[in-house]
């Protein structure tokens, strides 16, 4: 459950 944000609103959610 880790959320990472990159650049312009790109969201990567890893459980």
Swiss-Prot record:
Localization: Cell membrane
Protein's UniProt keywords contain Membrane: yes
GO BP terms, alphabetized: adaptive immune response
Chief location of this protein within or outside the cell: membrane
Keywords of this entry: Adaptive immunity, Cell membrane, Immunity, Membrane, Receptor, T cell receptor
KW Transmembrane helix (keyword) present: no
Residue ranges of the TM segments: none
GO CC entries: T cell receptor complex
Quaternary state and interactors: Alpha-beta TR is a heterodimer composed of an alpha and beta chain; disulfide-linked. The alpha-beta TR is associated with the transmembrane signaling CD3 coreceptor proteins to form the TR-CD3 (TcR or TCR). The assembly of alpha-beta TR heterodimers with CD3 occurs in the endoplasmic reticulum where a single alpha-beta TR heterodimer associates with one CD3D-CD3E heterodimer, one CD3G-CD3E heterodimer and one CD247 homodimer forming a stable octameric structure. CD3D-CD3E and CD3G-CD3E heterodimers preferentially associate with TR alpha and TR beta chains, respectively.
Functional note: J region of the variable domain of T cell receptor (TR) beta chain that participates in the antigen recognition. Alpha-beta T cell receptors are antigen specific receptors which are essential to the immune response and are present on the cell surface of T lymphocytes. Recognize peptide-major histocompatibility (MH) (pMH) complexes that are displayed by antigen presenting cells (APC), a prerequisite for efficient T cell adaptive immunity against pathogens.
Record's protein name: T cell receptor beta joining 1-1
Organism per entry: Homo sapiens
Name of the gene: TRBJ1-1
């Amino acid at each position: 459950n880790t959320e990472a944000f990159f650049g312009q609103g790109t969201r990567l959610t890893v459980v």
